[in-house]
Amino acid sequence: MIPSKRILTDKDVKIWEESETREDILSFIESLAKAVEGFENDQVSEPVSDSVQSTIAVLTEIDKLIKLHPVIQDKNTSRFGKVEFRDFYDDVCEKADDLLSSHFPALTSEQIEQLSIYLQESWGNKRRIDYGSGHELNFICFLYGLTHYKIFDLQRDARNLVLVLFIEYLKIMREIETLYWLEPAGSHGVWGLDDYHFLPFLFGAFQLAPHKHLKPKSIHNEELVEMFADKYLYFGCIAFINSVKTSTSLRWHSPMLDDISGVKKWSKVAEGMIKMYKAEVLGKLPIMQHFYFSEFLVCPEGISEPRTHIHNGDEDDDQCCQDGAAHNTWGDCCGIKIPSLYAANAMEKQSHKPIPFD
């Protein structure tokens, strides 16, 4: 079967939420989170398996593709996403199958077909030039698929799937977001964790859960944030947000993170992150309507028939944000264009005038 999108209505979401497939992907995320509990970013599990190293090699090749597509058109004028991202995206799609077959020779052509779409869709949407938690979920599905096909062994590799692979993926995504000014897909704006990512906060909260000295309120201490930004994903995210949202304090530009900082224990934050991910990512139609079902992520019975599938990112998404999604409050996943942080900052530097963004 060719991976396809099937979640089109609120009824589909309800069926999905009660499905074994949704439970499988959530359990996978929880397993990864628990595997990094108490570990800093550089405390990888040694030795790093050949499978993890092969996946790093795939990510490295994708990172190299960015250099082949520098921003030229409207470099300093457009407030929205850079069209060169589409060339990068096309390059990833063109090379994805070969990358997987060369670095994972044990995979069959059918398995590569199943995995490839998740790898392609991990970097953002070609047509809209945006990125959000749904694309981040695709990368997790890619790792899940490699685990399903016995490339990864969770007992051996779980910690490194986060501390090696996810951290490398996040680094590449920050580069892509910064260079191509990707627009936030389905962002809550100031009422979200981050304009783009969710899982670094979830994994980061689990890392810190047993910490005896750092508290959730420590994110307001700039010295502590700077000191621990490279050690813990959560502090790294706070440092990154502070570096791009410089006009006001965290309390004003990220009130949800400010609210979370009032929680007494990181273990409670971690618990809350799982609940929030279930509700705000896996339970939202504007995100899950872009989710691909496949041979290893089986579509539950009763869900709508698949829409037309195109592998090159040019699908029109005619049904996007319709039926149930039009009445969902999560955000404009593919409607109103929202300029990225990077665009707003760059334009502000040029004009020396504040741009209303947050």
UniProtKB/Swiss-Prot annotation:
Gene Ontology cellular component terms for the protein in this record: cytoplasm; nucleus; protein phosphatase type 2A complex
Protein location: Cytoplasm
Catalysed transformations (reactions): [protein]-peptidylproline (omega=180) = [protein]-peptidylproline (omega=0)
Pfam families (alphabetical): PTPA (PF03095)
Enzyme class, spelled out: isomerase
Residue stretches spanning the membrane: none
Keyword field: Cytoplasm, Isomerase, Rotamase
EC number: 5.2.1.8
MF GO annotations: peptidyl-prolyl cis-trans isomerase activity; protein tyrosine phosphatase activator activity
One GO biological process term: mitotic spindle organization
Function: PPIases accelerate the folding of proteins. It catalyzes the cis-trans isomerization of proline imidic peptide bonds in oligopeptides. Acts as a regulatory subunit for PP2A-like phosphatases modulating their activity or substrate specificity, probably by inducing a conformational change in the catalytic subunit, a direct target of the PPIase. Can reactivate inactive phosphatase PP2A-phosphatase methylesterase complexes (PP2Ai) in presence of ATP and Mg(2+) by dissociating the inactive form from the complex.
Family named by the database record: Belongs to the PTPA-type PPIase family.
Name of the protein in question: Serine/threonine-protein phosphatase 2A activator 2
Taxonomic source organism: Candida glabrata (strain ATCC 2001 / BCRC 20586 / JCM 3761 / NBRC 0622 / NRRL Y-65 / CBS 138)
